[in-house]
Amino acid sequence: MEKKEMMYEGKAKKVYSTEDPEKVVIYYKDDATAFNGEKKGQIEDKGVLNNNITSMLFELLEKHGVKTHFEKKLSDREQLCKKVEIVPLEVIVRNVAAGSMAKRLGLEEGYELKTTVFELSYKDDALGDPLINDTHAVAIGATTFEELDKIYAATKTVNDVLKEFFHKQGIKLIDFKIEFGRYNGEVLLADEISPDTCRLWDEKTNEKLDKDRFRRDMGNVKEAYVEILNRITGK
């Protein structure tokens, strides 16, 4: 399906309309940002790697009953997706303390949490995507309690499926953030799942295989993304 006009350009992707008003083409860029856009750069072939990783993980989740916006991969950088109305929230899932949570709560990075933590952030770059709670989200009109129930149920399944899947590849799923969209009365998993949106550590060495390598100037960023793709595809 051919793409037409560009409807939206974000930090990591471009969204194009198609001849079908219900479908869009999503193009994955090599641009990399961190700290709400304060740090910017490029990671060679990141768009290709993230498109391939996301396509595979969304297909996996669909097989486990998670409804997503993903239709099919069109090329190395493009995928066909349902046109959704994005819920203006990010759902953050934390299995191990790292990043902002470790800093905020004074925890050592790598601390094994006693239970999985679910957080919400309000998608607003100007505000720095602030953390909010469920009642905030409903009070400001971002969602409803009924919709949140569906979002949390899907999120729990995503975490359960991905934790087990990554474990089989020798990868520890530290945390991740996901987004959802509305489509014909349903709530679908949208956006992407990749080393841009997940913290992924090698189970044996705790080597970071995700965007923290870019955030923290650790080097070998592309190599880490390639390692994730190779492991999940069995190469």
Curated annotation (Swiss-Prot):
Keyword Nucleotide-binding: yes
CDD domains: SAICAR_synt_PurC
This protein's encoding gene: purC
GO biological process: 'de novo' IMP biosynthetic process; cobalamin biosynthetic process
Stated name of the protein: Phosphoribosylaminoimidazole-succinocarboxamide synthase
UniProt-listed Enzyme Commission number(s): 6.3.2.6
Assigned protein family: Belongs to the SAICAR synthetase family.
MF (Gene Ontology): ATP binding; phosphoribosylaminoimidazolesuccinocarboxamide synthase activity
InterPro entries in UniProt: SAICAR_synt/ADE2_N, SAICAR_synt_PurC, SAICAR_synth, SAICAR_synthetase, SAICAR_synthetase_CS
Statement: the UniProt record of this protein carries the keyword Secreted: no
Pathway listed: Purine metabolism; IMP biosynthesis via de novo pathway; 5-amino-1-(5-phospho-D-ribosyl)imidazole-4-carboxamide from 5-amino-1-(5-phospho-D-ribosyl)imidazole-4-carboxylate: step 1/2
UniProt keyword terms in alphabetical order: ATP-binding, Ligase, Nucleotide-binding, Purine biosynthesis
Reaction(s) catalysed by this chain's protein: 5-amino-1-(5-phospho-D-ribosyl)imidazole-4-carboxylate + L-aspartate + ATP = (2S)-2-[5-amino-1-(5-phospho-beta-D-ribosyl)imidazole-4-carboxamido]succinate + ADP + phosphate + 2 H(+)
Enzyme class: ligase
Annotated NCBIfam families: purC (TIGR00081)
